Structures are given as C-alpha cells and as structure tokens.
C-alpha cells in the first residue's frame, strides 16, 4: 500500500529538508494527539529544517492510540499538517518524529525504559487536565484516582503519567544519568506547576529522598500554546489526501496561526525553538492568562451558546452579527480589564482572534470545544468573574457564558433534543426549566 513515505509527493507539498537519519529520541512525548502533531512537533520540525540536528521525538501512548501508532510506523513516522487559511492551504510533511511506542503494541516496560535512555533531555506532555491526576479543589495529587492507587501499590509498573515520570526519574538517578526537563504543553493554567505538583506528590508518597532529588535537579517550565486544531474527520482526511495524491491516516488540519511561549528553564538542553518563532521568556503567566481568558473564554462562550442556537461550527457563529459582537465585547470589556500583561495591544489581539474564529476553511465544531467544560471554565471564565466581583464591575456576558454551559450540561436543548455531553462532571440528572 502506498504511503507518504513511499511515493513522490507533489511539488507544492513541503517535505523535510534535513537528514532524518541523524535524529535521536532526545524528546519523549506523552500524547500523540491532534494538537501536538500540529504544534510542538511541527515547530521542532521547523527548527530541524532551519539548522538540522538530532532533536528527534519519540511518541508515547499508553492504553489507547495503538491503531494510530501502527499507521504512523507504516509511513516511517511521517505525517501531514494541512494549514488552512482563508486565502489557501499549505501541506507540510513533518519528519521530526523518530519513533513511537505504545503499551499495547510494545510493552509498558519498554516505554519506561525509553525514558531512561541517556540521550533523553525533555519529556513533554499533552495529556489534558485529567491526565495529571490532580485534585482540582486542592491542586495536589489525587490519591483517590484509581491509576494513582494502582501506581502506589505497584510503583514499578505504573499506569499514570505521574507514576511513569517518577519511576523513570528514580531509575535515572540510580543509574547515574542526568535528569530530564518535564515540559507540559497542555492548555491549562500554570501547567508547569500542575505537572510539578503531580510528580512531586507521587515521589513524596514513594520516597521523600527521591522527591528532594527531583525538586533540586528537575525543571518544570511553564508554557502557553495557541493554535486552533479541529479533530480529524473523514472529510478533513479526504481533503488532505487530495492535496497529497495518497492517503495519510495520521494527518491533521489546522489554522495558519501558531504561537508558543515557553519559560526558558531546561536542565539538559533544548532545541533552538526560537529559530521557529517560539517566544522564550522568563515568565509565561501574563501570556497564559491573556490566551485563556480572551481566546479560550470566548471560544467556550461561542461553543455553548452557539451549539444551543443550532450552530455546528465556530465559523458559523461568527457569521451571526450578534454572536460576533458579543464575542468581541466579552474579550475587550470583561476579559481584557482582568489582565496584567504589558506591551500588548489587546484590541488588536481581539480583532485577530475574531478573524481566526471566522476562518471558513476550519470546521471547528462547537460540540468539540464544549467538552470537559467543568474543568475548563474555572480558568476561562470564573477567574475573570472573581476579579469583577472584587471590583464590583460588570460581568454580564461572562454570566451568560456560564448560563450557556449550565443549559448545555443539562443534556437537553430548548427544543427537547438530547445533547451528547462529554464532561467529567455530569449534570444530566438536572432538569432545567424551559423559558417560554
């Protein structure tokens, strides 16, 4: 069967210009999902195209994703990113992935040993909020989580990300190897501290001495990530196949815009990501708050209210003048005043966000963005509401967004149609009154 690795691709497709034989698994990444493929891996690929090097990525998935990993191996770990702009598309073949491991295809033991190889300098993660096994109420490791319970009972055969990281660091310490940097790339507030709390919490339960070594020698930089990457669909994969002339089951579509802000704190080196436009900074927090409240907050606002209004995609919402005006007003009148970022034109930033949301080439489903709202709204909306309450200033659109979420998670829309709610906290038992 032909793959992108076995055929001559059209000239308009950008392929790797570097020697992939030089790559090593310097980065091990948890979570080979759509966002990582279109963001961190792509930016690492840009660095390699600019100056070569050996900064390859080993992709890790634990108890799912075996089919995707098999498909990736069948095409020599290459995959396609299709950047879709209002004025045209660009197909890019990403070659930064060096190898991949999956617990079903390989073994859990092989995965843990991969983290212990001497050349590994960075372990990065895109595992969503749930993957860190943190109690959202306390910010500490959730010791009632079934995977954490398992890992504390059988620490040498861990099933959670914190358990695997601690076991790998323990083995590296015992073998006299340098530690690695743990780099969370998830779209959650203060992600560096989240993963640090998870790892140190697990280590403390196993060995206070080990926890002390990790605290002294391992770094957990914060990051801010930004790119709109809809989930792959049969339609998007068929469109990419037309561009390539061959099928790529690992391909993903996204918008042209990309941003990555990274705290420059690495204990064992890193790629020269700044060559690819990454902003290496001392403090990520102001950037993170700007993005979470202005972009993600308005995204959630549009997702819940748009879905309830019958809009399938964010771009559909933006064709409605009322939704477009409400989203921009939310950004500038209610979210921007809560921020402390300097030297950024927030009006210009809001206008760029509106243009990105309106991109007709992206089919970003309101239903997809509406997932896991109980874990997303605290940082996207409630943080801003808390500030407004202290100042006694207006937050009526934020209130409307939260009300939209409440209606959505009830599981039934105003027409009586069932909603497929995907949220760790289920409110489908609630019956909300229909307003007539």
Where are these regions (language model features)?
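Substrate/ligand-engaging "lid" and interaction regions
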Residues: 2-430, 436
